Amino acid sequence: MEEKRRKYSISSDNSDTTDSHATSTSASRCSKLPSSTKSGWPRQNEKKPSEVFRTDLITAMKIPDSYQLSPDDYYILADPWRQEWEKGVQVPAGAEAIPEPVVRILPPLEGPPAQASPSSTMLGEGSQPDWPGGSRYDLDEIDAYWLELINSELKEMERPELDELTLERVLEELETLCHQNMARAIETQEGLGIEYDEDVVCDVCRSPEGEDGNEMVFCDKCNVCVHQACYGILKVPTGSWLCRTCALGVQPKCLLCPKRGGALKPTRSGTKWVHVSCALWIPEVSIGCPEKMEPITKISHIPASRWALSCSLCKECTGTCIQCSMPSCVTAFHVTCAFDHGLEMRTILADNDEVKFKSFCQEHSDGGPRNEPTSEPTEPSQAGEDLEKVTLRKQRLQQLEEDFYELVEPAEVAERLDLAEALVDFIYQYWKLKRKANANQPLLTPKTDEVDNLAQQEQDVLYRRLKLFTHLRQDLERVRNLCYMVTRRERTKHAICKLQEQIFHLQMKLIEQDLCRGLSTSFPIDGTFFNSWLAQSVQITAENMAMSEWPLNNGHREDPAPGLLSEELLQDEETLLSFMRDPSLRPGDPARKARGRTRLPAKKKPPPPPPQDGPGSRTTPDKAPKKTWGQDAGSGKGGQGPPTRKPPRRTSSHLPSSPAAGDCPILATPESPPPLAPETPDEAASVAADSDVQVPGPAASPKPLGRLRPPRESKVTRRLPGARPDAGMGPPSAVAERPKVSLHFDTETDGYFSDGEMSDSDVEAEDGGVQRGPREAGAEEVVRMGVLAS
């Protein structure tokens, strides 16, 4: 040690210790100074460092890169070098502090296996067949000291010594036999004698009798007695049996009465418990599965009046009560209280296999009034008897545990293990002393396969129920989310419908305002046709277009107002709109006359065939002829249906004629500039014959021009203006030359609008209840002809 210290003092590079060790070396150097400098108190040179690290091992590992080594002489570190590794390797601070192991050489196990092999097949249930396999019991210090003592005595007696493995094996066999015999004693009359108690009754039906297939079963923990059918036991177990509450290790309180314990069954939720007897006697409660007598259902069906009843026996308002079956008696009591007080509880089996329950109070029970004074003294006595039974059971169990050694015979153990009986007796006496010192508790815990698996089954049931509740919770969460989304969707739909309704009412209001100002019903009020007309490049070229020069029906001449309106219509679109909404320019008598004359065709009389064919009298072969606006007005007034506005299909090279029975003027263009290229053969023919229009006589048949559509249901169709030549008119007057009017329709609509677009506004206008006079009708005809002329 001194040599190491001198080495540390010379060079610090080869030191094997840290700074803490260096302090001790410096102290040792100072100790070599003259004695005159030393103090009187002794220096602690023996103090050693608490930790020692060797750095020479790290230094020996490091070599320069230029050093020549073969690939087999070194290892390559894949991890990066850490700085804390430079600290070194920790070594023990003092070699004398290292504990030295103490070992013993055991003799070879040749003799005992050879002795036990012939009888190894004769071993019992709890013994191990092979010795070298080990034992469940491990020797402790007390066992080791006792083994030394017994070996010394055996040596004095010149007998073979006892080894540790044999001692462990014998103790394990004693514990196994004791556990088996004690379980058998508890289950039989020799142990407690409960099964043969004549006074015990079923906790559900209160019957002391059992029968084949419906045996009386006792719980091994709470000692409750039930019939198989009463508690829903499908198969009687061979070993011990525990009720539902004992299997789960709980002691719940009944939901319907204040009593704890007894034959309880869970509700559907599994969190509340109810006596089976309470479930049977309360009429609103039901049982889900009669075979298993669980779960208890329909607890919520119990009325509030029953929950409010107070028991006349226990004076508590807990749970629910039943009432006396006598018609004039309303005494209430709990079911379990009635059983404990010995009230009369009858179970009557009806003819239709229906069970009726009759319960009576103390007054109406058989012998109730006579036994009423003695009922109170018998209550403590009955409770005392029950307590005495329980106390007796506990005493017998305790006595059985104290006399555990009587359940094991040393000779049986010696025979099963093929050992000397005297040696087994020595171990047996030691086993009794050690177990007594352990408060009669077993030295070995029962095996896992020896534990009743009923509790595990109950745990599995609860686990499956928990999983079921988890899935149910998830399903309910999905349903909640779905309901929320459906509700949000319906709210959005409702808001959209309300918005559409508001838009509809606003449109109706605007339409009513327009109709009140005299807007024509044949004009598209919804604005579709009007907007399309304004979007076109309308070209109007006219020099002298006077309404006075137009031929009139039956030679009648119009008032000068229509002619003035026609001249104003040639200016521009804004003037057209202003005159359309001006109520001052309205003809009076002609429109009234036209309405009066249009009633004749409304009677559906077939007109005679036309005298001649012409371009203006062509009809579409697959379309029915339409009625004039005057017919619509007359029929609408007569209650045949609302007028339907259907604008005619116009082309750029043909102008319509006036209706047959009205006083509207006829537009004729004898001489016109070259028209546009016709789109259809019919239009080409109409253009060719446009300058030579023949007006038929009064008997001319209606032949509409252009695309006509059949009338819609429950509505009277309107005959378009210019659909056929004028009927009932005389020879036409001289007509002045008028230029050709070119009206360019939009290519998308082509001057045609569907029935849905036109008829909806008509229905809205009629629903508005706007009544138009005769002058308004005449003004509408003039405005319509003005639009056609433009």
From Swiss-Prot:
UniProt xrefs under InterPro entries: Enhancer_polycomb-like_N, EPHD, Histone_Mod_Regulator, JADE2_ePHD, JADE2_PHD, Zinc_finger_PHD-type_CS, Znf_FYVE_PHD, Znf_PHD
Associated pathway: Protein modification; protein ubiquitination
GO cellular-component term (any): nucleoplasm
Biased composition (Basic and acidic residues): 737-747
Protein encoded by which gene: JADE2
Organism: Homo sapiens
Keywords, alphabetical: Acetylation, Metal-binding, Phosphoprotein, Repeat, Transferase, Ubl conjugation pathway, Zinc, Zinc-finger
Biased composition annotated in UniProt, kind: Acidic residues: 757-767
Protein name per UniProt: E3 ubiquitin-protein ligase Jade-2
Family per record: Belongs to the JADE family.
Regions of compositional bias (Polar residues) in chain numbering: 372-381
Subunit text: Component of the HBO1 complex composed at least of ING4 or ING5, MYST2/HBO1, MEAF6, and one of JADE1, JADE2 and JADE3. Interacts (via C-terminus) with KDM1A (via AOD/Tower domain).
